[in-house]
């Protein structure tokens, strides 16, 4: 059932050294390709790399696990093994609200496919654009909007019920806990 895949598609920040296959990467982008798009604009474009040297440079351009304590943050050996850079043309006529709506839908589809293929992902909006656009050799006419890191996850992620609306994620006993609000608190009556 798709709900199980959604529950299992979590943000991962620690990865093995296994390099993702080109075939699997293209399947992930195919998931994004078939996403719904505001006015069927389909304005998103995807760059990716699994090159070790580039991935090392790109890792320095993101902060993984900003809320986590230093001792449970990923080590350099646990860095992502791949990066997607999602971009739009600078002269797009789409308002940002639609760009980010499309981006969210496409990113979720890409991450769902990645999880199904055995990869973990983490969608990142706070990254060093200059570093990413240079390392990924993004053509001048494009503006990057998001990063998705990926690889074979080595961290364990567990969904737990939020208590008193506390939703900050944390690591306890080596397991990454992600509090989720109860269903009845999400419904406006």
Language model features by range: what are they?
Residues 1-189:
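Acidic, surface-exposed loops and disordered segments
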């Amino acid at each position: 059932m798709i709900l199980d895949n959604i529950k299992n598609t979590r943000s991962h920040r620690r990865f093995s050294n296994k390099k993702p296959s080109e075939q699997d990467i293209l399947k992930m982008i195919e998931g994004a390709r078939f996403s719904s798009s505001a006015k069927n604009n389909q304005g998103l474009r995807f760059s990716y790399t699994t090159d070790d040297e580039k991935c090392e440079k790109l890792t320095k351009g993101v902060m993984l696990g900003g809320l986590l304590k230093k001792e449970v943050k990923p080590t350099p050996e646990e860095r992502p093994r791949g990066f997607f850079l999602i971009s739009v043309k600078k002269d797009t006529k789409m308002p940002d609200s639609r760009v980010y709506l499309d981006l969210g839908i496409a990113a979720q589809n890409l991450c769902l496919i990645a999880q199904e293929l055995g990869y973990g992902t983490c969608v990142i909006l706070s990254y060093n654009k200059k570093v990413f656009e240079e390392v990924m050799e993004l053509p001048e006419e494009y503006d990057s909007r998001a990063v998705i890191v990926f690889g074979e996850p080595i961290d364990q992620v567990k969904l737990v019920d939020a208590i008193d609306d506390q939703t900050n994620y944390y690591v306890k006993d080596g397991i990454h806990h992600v509090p989720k609000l109860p269903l009845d608190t999400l419904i406006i009556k």
